[in-house]
């Protein structure tokens, strides 16, 4: 059985920065033997990859025909299933201004909301309106960096959904580009590693429904996120169950006839086709959805090794299980949901639309049972603490 680390350990010993090309291929050299073995055993499936790419697109066209592209419609009536609030401004088309952000906004350099490979996110306020926002300051070292950020702006201009962070303004200077966006509470990752935050299966259902709704919308717009992970899921506030997906810096426009390959991402969440430098598609995001589900339910990382090379080896082998004690009280529906996503052959994974129809996310009787179980456990906890 694959040895996994708790997320508390991950946060202290494992970097979540995306792989640089050199580091990526250095890791790949170490797992080449495993890769070759796996390719020999899956050759028949790989021959079908071209057809599978076309087949994966059928459901998206059908969804468009049915006119179900929604800005934030809900798919269930759970007690806590309240839609995430819309951004405090109308969706707008943004172009980077060649001007100073300080002309229109007060950026608080001391109030840092988060950070990553790109730089830092600071609290900011629009001077004319007092609107509270967030300023993502992205350092750009050359033309390629600027092109990447402008791609992120282009992607965000196309996305208008309550579960996706919204872009308000942008500014370009010689050494950076600043994106002014809607501001939210904190990372879902913070909740996972918080010992005082007891995520239940029902909580996880609420989170995953919203993630799938946001991803379904992106896929209907033919956009792949390609960097889904708990750090890129923001909770609206500390206590609410509403979330928004952020960071579209690695997102790509998906054109089925133009085979897309990528060699970036966060090791733990990479799909096998990314590790293999094979074609990616909608189902590449769905693999990451499976990993996130596994983490939220158990606090464990399904493929994490002692180093990046071992992690990639585990992913290529699709080596995971549900045998840890953390899954003892998890429903069979949840386990089946994960098993529909963590599949090496990408064409076999369920789509975001299909995920939302899966019993784990759509069965009201199951949700009622889990709610009763949650209330029962809360009652027992209250008695023991008195």
Curated annotation (Swiss-Prot):
InterPro entries in UniProt: Kinase-like_dom_sf, Prot_kinase_dom, Protein_kinase_ATP_BS, Ser/Thr_kinase_AS
Domain Protein kinase as annotated: residue spans: 107-361
UniProt EC number: 2.7.11.1
Keyword field: ATP-binding, Kinase, Nucleotide-binding, Phosphoprotein, Serine/threonine-protein kinase, Transferase
GO molecular function, one term: protein serine/threonine kinase activity
Lineage, uppermost ranks: Eukaryota, Metazoa, Chordata, Craniata, Vertebrata
Gene designation: Mylk4
Protein name: Myosin light chain kinase family member 4
Catalytic residue positions: 227 (proton acceptor)
Phosphoserine modification, residue list: 100
Family to which this protein belongs: Belongs to the protein kinase superfamily. CAMK Ser/Thr protein kinase family.
Top EC category: transferase
Any single Pfam family the record assigns to this protein: Pkinase
Top-level taxon in the UniProt lineage: Eukaryota
Source organism per UniProt: Mus musculus (Mouse)
SUPFAM superfamilies: Protein kinase-like (PK-like) (SSF56112)
Keyword Phosphoprotein: yes
Catalytic activity, as annotated: L-seryl-[protein] + ATP = O-phospho-L-seryl-[protein] + ADP + H(+); L-threonyl-[protein] + ATP = O-phospho-L-threonyl-[protein] + ADP + H(+)
Cleaved signal peptide residues: none
Entry annotated with the keyword Transferase: yes
Binding site for ATP: 113-121, 136
């Amino acid at each position: 059985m694959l040895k996994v680390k708790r997320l508390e350990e991950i946060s202290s010993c494992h970097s979540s920065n995306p792989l640089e090309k050199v580091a990526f291929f250095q890791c790949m050299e170490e797992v080449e033997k495993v890769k070759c073995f796996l390719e020999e055993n899956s050759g028949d499936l790989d021959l079908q990859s071209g057809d599978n790419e076309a087949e994966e697109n059928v459901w998206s066209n059908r969804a468009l025909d049915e006119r179900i592209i929604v800005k934030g419609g809900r798919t269930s009536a759970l007690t806590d299933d309240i839609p995430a609030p819309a951004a405090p401004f109308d969706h707008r088309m943004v172009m980077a201004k060649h001007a100073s952000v300080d002309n229109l906004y007060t950026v608080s350099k001391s109030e840092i909301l988060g950070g990553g490979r790109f730089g830092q996110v600071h609290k900011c306020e629009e001077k004319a309106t007092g609107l509270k926002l967030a300023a993502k300051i992205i350092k750009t070292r050359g033309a390629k960096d600027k092109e990447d950020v402008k791609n992120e702006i282009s992607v965000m201009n196309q996305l208008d959904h309550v579960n996706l962070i919204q872009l308000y303004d942008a500014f370009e200077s010689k050494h950076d580009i600043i994106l002014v966006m809607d501001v939210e509470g904190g990372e879902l990752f913070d909740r996972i590693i918080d010992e005082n935050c007891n995520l239940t299966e029902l909580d996880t259902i609420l989170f995953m429904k919203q993630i799938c709704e946001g991803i379904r919308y992106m896929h209907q717009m033919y956009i792949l996120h390609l960097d889904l992970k708990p750090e890129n899921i923001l909770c609206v506030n500390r206590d609410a169950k509403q979330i928004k997906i952020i960071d579209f810096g690695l997102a790509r426009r998906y054109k089925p006839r133009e085979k897309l390959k990528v060699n970036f991402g966060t090791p733990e969440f990479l799909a096998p086709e990314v590790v293999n430098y094979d074609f990616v598609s909608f189902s590449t995001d769905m693999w990451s959805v499976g990993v996130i589900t596994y983490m939220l339910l158990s606090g464990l990382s399904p493929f994490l090794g002692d180093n990046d090379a071992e992690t990639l080896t585990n992913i290529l082998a699709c080596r995971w299980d549900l045998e840890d004690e953390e899954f003892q009280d998890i429903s069979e529906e949840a386990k089946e949901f994960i098993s529909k996503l963590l599949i090496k052959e990408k064409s076999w994974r369920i789509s975001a639309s299909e995920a939302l129809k899966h019993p784990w996310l759509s069965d009201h009787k199951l949700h009622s049972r889990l709610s009763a179980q949650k209330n029962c456990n809360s009652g027992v906890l209250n008695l023991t603490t008195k």
